[in-house]
């Protein structure tokens, strides 16, 4: 699905607000030149704590909260793309858990904000929709 999804992503980049969740997070970063790799541990139905870092423009910097994870792949780091900032990381593993591109209005979560395992998931989506 990546080739077709990447084509659609590139068509709307900078024209429409884009939110990538889980595989969408991976697909957007892949389209921006990132490598996506297998994790040592698979997280299906797993709750992890994340930390919002200083580069976030949307979320409370320094805040920790729990999120629902359902994935076996992750972003290979280091990763750098113009206007993309990794804004949340898993407290335990340090894995990238969200990004923001506030210029093109592109956002992504490696976790599932809609999951009952994610605390305040609706608030996360509302903040992106109002950005």
Model-found features: residue ranges?
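Proline-centered loop/turn at the N-terminus of a beta-strand
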Residues: 17-19, 35, 66, 105
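Catalytic nucleophile loop
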Residues: 25
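Conserved donor sugar-nucleotide recognition element shared by glycan-biosynthetic enzymes
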Residues: 1, 43, 121
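C-terminal and late-domain segments of enzyme folds
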Residues: 85-131
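A conserved active-site-flanking secondary-structure segment within enzyme catalytic domains
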Residues: 30-67, 94
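Catalytic beta-strand/loop cores that center a nucleophilic Ser/Cys/Thr
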Residues: 56-103
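Flexible gly/pro-rich beta->alpha loop and the following alpha-helix that scaffold active-site loops
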Residues: 1-20, 32, 117, 126
């Amino acid at each position: 699905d990546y080739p077709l999804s990447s084509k659609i992503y590139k068509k709307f980049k900078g024209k429409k607000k884009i939110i990538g969740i889980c595989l969408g997070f991976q697909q957007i970063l892949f389209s921006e030149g990132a490598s996506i790799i297998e994790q040592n541990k698979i997280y299906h139905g797993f709750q992890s704590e994340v930390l919002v870092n200083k580069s976030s423009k949307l979320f409370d910097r320094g805040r920790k909260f729990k999120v629902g994870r359902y994935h076996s792949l992750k972003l290979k780091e280091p990763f750098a793309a113009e206007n993309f900032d990794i804004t949340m990381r898993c407290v335990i593993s340090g894995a990238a858990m969200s990004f923001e591109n506030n210029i093109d209005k592109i956002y992504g979560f490696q976790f599932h904000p809609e999951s009952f395992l994610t605390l305040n998931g609706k608030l996360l989506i509302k903040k992106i929709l109002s950005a």
